[in-house]
Amino acid sequence: MHFEHVAMNVPDPRAMARWYVEHLGMRIVRQVDAPPYMHFLADVTGRVVFELYANDLAAIPNYAEQHPLILHNAFAVEDMDGTIERLTAAGASVFSDETLPDGGRLAMLRDPWGIALQLTQRAVPLGA
C-alpha cells in the first residue's frame, strides 16, 4: 500500500489550481473540465499530490475560519523572506512567522481561499 493523494473540497478548484501552479510550483497531472472540476496537482518531486474539486454532495469547509493547526499544507522553502513576499503579493496573507530554538523557521500563511499553507525552513530537514 502507498499514499496516493489528499483531497480538498474547495469553492473554485480551477482558479485554485492555477494559483498553486503559478505560485507554489505545482503541476497539474490530471484534470476534469466538468463538475466537480477535479484537478490533481503534484509537487516538484511528483510524490505529493493534492486533489482539488468542488463537489456539491458535501459542504465546502470555511477554511479561513479554521485555525491553521487543524489543517495546513506544508512546503519546504529555501528563501523564507522572499517566498513570503512573493506569496503575499499574489494574494496570500501571513498568519504567523516564528524562528524555532534550533534556528529553523516556520511561517503560516493563508492562500487566497483561506487554506493554511505552512512554509518550513528546517534546521534539520525531515528525513535527514
Set out the residue ranges of the language-model regions.
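Vicinal oxygen chelate
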Residues: 40, 84-128
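Core segments of cupin and vicinal oxygen chelate
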Residues: 8-50
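Exposed loop/turn and edge beta-strand positions of beta-sandwich/beta-sheet ligand-binding modules
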Residues: 35, 69, 103
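Acetyl-CoA-dependent GNAT
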Residues: 31, 53-58, 121-124
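N-terminal beta-strand motif that seeds the catalytic metal site of vicinal oxygen chelate
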Residues: 1-17, 70-75, 123-128
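A short, acidic/glycine-rich surface segment
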Residues: 36-38, 57-63, 127-128
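Mid-chain, well-packed structural core segment of small domains
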Residues: 69-87
